[in-house]
C-alpha cells in the first residue's frame, strides 16, 4: 500500500540551520508511520556541513529536500521598499510566499518556522479541512492586545489588528 505524502516546508539561512534541525527532529519524533513526509528546506547561504547534517536526519518515511532560493530572490531584493525591519528579519521570511510557484506539484502543504518545536503528530494539522479557504492560520493575538503593535500593523502595514495573522505555522 502506498502511503500518502505530507509536504512540510521550512525557510532558512545558515544561521537557522541548528534551529530547523531541532524542529525537524521534533517532527520526526511525533510523525505518524502511516504517512511519508517530504520536508522541503528552502535556503539561502547554507553551508555544506549544515546541509549534510540536515540530510542525515532522513528516516524511512521522512525525506529531506534542500532547495536553494536563487532566481526568485531577485524579486524581493531588487526593491529596497520590500524590506521590513531588516535588522530583525532576514530575507528568508519572504520565501514562504514562493512555495506555490516553486512547488506546483503540491495541492496542500504545511509551512513551519525554523524555531518551532512540533509536539504532536503534524498529520493531524495537515488533515484539517480548510473548506474554501486558501490558508489555515490564526490571528496573531499579540497584535490585538498591544496598542503599539496594533497601531503599527494598522497604520504602516495597512492590516486591521484583528486580521493580522501569525505566519509561523501555515
Task: List PLM regions with ranges.
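Glycosyltransferase catalytic domains, chiefly GT-A lineage
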Residues: 1-170
Amino acid at each position: 500500500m502506498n502511503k500518502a505524502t505530507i509536504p512540510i516546508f521550512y525557510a532558512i539561512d545558515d544561521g537557522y540551520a541548528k534551529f530547523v534541525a531541532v524542529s525537524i527532529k521534533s517532527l520526526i519524533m511525533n510523525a505518524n508511520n502511516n504517512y511519508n513526509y517530504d520536508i522541503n528546506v528552502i535556503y539561502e547561504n547554507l553551508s555544506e556541513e549544515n546541509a549534510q547534517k540536515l540530510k542525515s536526519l532522513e528516516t524511512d518515511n521522512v525525506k529531506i529536500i534542500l532547495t536553494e532560493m536563487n532566481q526568485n530572490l531577485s524579486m524581493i531584493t531588487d526593491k529596497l521598499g520590500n524590506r521590513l525591519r531588516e535588522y530583525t528579519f532576514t530575507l528568508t521570511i519572504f520565501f514562504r510566499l514562493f512555495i506555490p510557484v516553486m512547488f506546483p506539484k503540491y495541492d496542500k502543504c504545511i509551512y513551519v518556522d525554523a524555531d518551532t518545536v512540533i509536539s504532536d503528530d503534524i498529520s493531524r494539522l495537515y488533515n484539517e479541512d480548510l473548506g474554501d479557504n486558501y490558508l489555515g492560520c490564526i490571528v496573531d493575538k499579540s497584535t490585538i492586545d498591544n496598542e503599539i503593535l496594533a497601531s503599527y500593523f494598522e497604520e504602516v502595514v495597512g492590516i486591521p489588528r484583528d486580521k493580522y495573522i501569525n505566519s509561523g505555522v501555515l
